[in-house]
Amino acid sequence: MQKSKQTVCTAALIVINMGIFFLLSFLGNPENAVFMIKYGAMYPPLIFEDTQYYRLITCIFLHFGIDHLMNNMVMLGALGWNLEKEIGSFKFLLIYFVSGIGANLISLAMDFYTGNLAVSAGASGAIFGLLGALLWVVIRNRGKVGRLTGRGILFMVLLSLYFGFTSTGVDNAAHVGGLICGFLTAVLLYHGRNVPRQEV
């Protein structure tokens, strides 16, 4: 089976995220929590009490400032390009959104457990899902896909988690949740294309 040569969805997601950010920057201040809640950021009381479940999706497309946006878009471009090219656009999108929503649900569960009422937004949960999916893909392809190696992906996972847990204001529950959701979704969707060759 030929792998897809197109990475249209990765490019589209980057354009959409950047477009939404610059539109909101024109309308107000994306670094203001109240403003971001108005436009779809995740806030536990509005989901638990007002059943505004759409926020589990809308918050994936929102970012608190240009640095937050650019960091996520660089990672989305690098990881998405490799993953979408390998598994195809449909499975890529499925992993992206399952990971993003799953990450937000796990973040909400942690908020409920800790009583934290933080406003959260960003594509990082979905992007960690791509990282988890790529980890499974390289495992299935005997340690390498394109220029990516299993060691490289594992190092990226550990480094990303380290920076998350040693920084403030980071939704680590969403990151870990996205990573797990992406890995498990990839296990279900991707069965590998490389098999050991038999000598004749």
Please tell me what each predicted stretch does.
Residues 1-200:
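A detector for small-residue-rich transmembrane helices and their helix-helix packing motifs
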